[in-house]
Every structure is written in structure tokens, then in C-alpha cells.
Regions:
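Short, surface-exposed structural microsegments at secondary-structure boundaries
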Residues: 1-137
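Eukaryotic C-terminal
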Residues: 2-4, 89, 104-116, 120-122, ...
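Alpha-helical scaffolding within the catalytic cores
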Residues: 139-142
């Protein structure tokens, strides 16, 4: 039976150190990195059972653990040279960092939520703050206040018509993540829920072309920025409905322009 081997560039070790570093740097691609924080109570010891009545567990015994289903970058698992180049070299433009360990150390309601002996305290996630997108999906964004200022690209999943999202989450985005450059919102009920959202809501002050809406994976995972999505949905509305029926459903200035075009066309016939 034929065997398959991975191509190997044997002269690579003989290249100059600078050239090898540049090659490692060129292997770096943007990733979407899933990050979440889970809270649990540790098992109660016998001494605690004797000293604490049932149902009166202290808040400061809660443990916050960092979780991610995203594997570490392959380059960092390749060899020592690649790992050192992409994490410590001063001339490499896109460096990976041990990130987000402070999320497990955040205090909650005035109590320290990590016990000193908890081994989970040392957990971290490799993240490139210049390229990677942090994907928090349905997690409360306030869990990320300790690191929000570092985040440039955010992905989350929400029901856009949900009252909590409209009144609270939208306002919180800019407060928790003040330095965002792009945001990716997975619309739980479908991408068309994003139609004209940037006209009504302020997503951390981002321009509409930097606000992306997505279908969930089970609906196809289609992604479009706000400008393109609005244009697509508007085109569909106009094709499927009479202009009279569209009044109030599309931007007023667009509706008036279309009505003028229709009137001019009728007069020219």
C-alpha cells in the first residue's frame, strides 16, 4: 500500500536566521479564537460542611475558569525556533501572547473568585492581538472587561431583536471593547436581522463597512458587512414588492428617489 509523506524542505536549516524568521512570520494567518469563562463551586470539604450551613456557601469560594475549544497555533507546536520567533522576536510584526489568564482572576461582586491553590489559575490562551478575532459567542461581554481594551476584533452571537441586546449589549460593546476595529455578529435568527441595524445602533463607533453580520453555521454561515447587507435586502424588497407597499420599510430618501424614478418613467412612456 502506498504511503503518503509530507513534503520537507531539507535546506531550511541552512537558511540565514533572518530569512527563517521571516518565513515563520509569513505562516501566521488570522484566526477566530473561542474564549469563554465558566464559574463553578469547588467541592465542599468536611470542615466546611461543619462550619457552613447548607445553602449558605460564601461567594468568595466560586472559581472562575478560562476555557477555549480553539487549538494553539500550529506554528507554536512545530519547533522551538518557530515558537521563540513568533512569541518573543522583537522584529516580528505579529506576535502571539499568553493571553486572558486575568479573566480567571477577575473579582466578582467584591470577592476574589479564584482560590490561590487552584491550578486553573495558570491557564492561558495563545492569541495574536493584531490579527486574531476573539469569539465570545453567547457569553456575557462584561466577563471580558479586564482585557477588553486589548481586543481589536470581536465575534459574538445574539438575537438582535432581543430587548436586552438592543438596550444593554449594544451600549456595552463600546464600553467593554473601546478599541475595536471590526465586529462580527452572528444573527441567531438569520443574517437578514442585521438589515439597517447600523442606522439604529452604534457598534463602538465603527463605520458600517466594519460591522459584519453572519448567518449561523446551520443556516450556511454567510457573512456580509452592513453596507452590502442593506443593499442586498433593499434590492430584494424592491424586486418583490410595489413601491407603495415599501413606504416605511426602506429608508425614506431611497423610497422617495425610487418613486421619482418610477414617476419619470411613467411620464416618458
Amino acid at each position: 500500500m502506498a504511503t503518503t509523506t509530507t513534503p520537507t524542505f531539507h535546506p531550511f536549516p541552512r537558511l540565514s536566521f533572518e530569512l527563517r524568521n521571516r518565513i515563520w512570520e509569513l505562516t501566521v494567518d488570522p484566526r477566530s479564537v473561542e474564549v469563554s469563562v465558566v464559574t463553578r463551586y469547588p467541592k465542599t470539604t468536611k470542615s466546611e460542611l461543619r462550619n457552613v450551613q447548607a445553602g449558605q456557601r460564601s461567594h468568595n469560594s466560586r472559581l472562575r475558569h478560562l476555557r477555549s475549544s480553539t487549538a494553539a497555533p500550529a506554528q507554536l507546536q512545530c519547533c522551538r525556533e518557530a515558537r521563540e520567533c513568533l512569541t518573543t522576536h522583537p522584529k516580528v510584526g505579529y506576535l502571539y501572547s499568553r493571553a486572558f489568564s486575568e479573566l480567571a482572576q477577575k473579582t466578582n461582586q467584591g470577592f476574589d473568585t479564584v482560590l490561590e491553590h487552584d491550578p486553573e489559575l495558570e491557564r492561558y490562551i495563545w492569541f495574536n492581538f493584531d490579527l486574531d478575532t476573539i469569539s465570545i459567542e453567547g457569553t456575557n461581554m462584561h466577563e471580558f472587561e479586564a482585557v477588553g481594551y486589548q481586543i481589536k476584533r470581536l465575534r459574538l452571537e445574539r438575537v438582535l431583536d432581543d430587548e436586552y441586546f438592543a438596550r444593554t449589549d449594544v451600549r456595552s460593546i463600546g464600553k467593554v471593547f473601546p478599541n475595536l476595529r471590526e465586529i462580527y455578529i452572528v444573527c441567531s435568527l438569520g443574517i437578514r436581522d442585521g438589515y439597517r441595524r447600523t442606522e439604529e445602533d452604534d457598534y463602538a463607533g465603527l463605520a458600517p463597512e466594519n460591522v459584519y453580520f453572519l448567518d449561523p453555521e446551520h443556516l450556511g454561515g454567510v457573512m456580509m458587512n452592513s453596507v452590502d447587507l442593506d443593499a442586498l435586502v433593499l434590492e430584494e424588497y424592491v424586486a418583490e414588492n410595489s413601491l407603495e407597499d415599501l413606504e416605511g420599510c426602506i429608508p425614506t430618501e431611497v423610497w422617495e428617489e425610487l418613486m421619482m424614478q418610477q414617476t419619470a418613467g411613467d411620464q416618458g412612456q
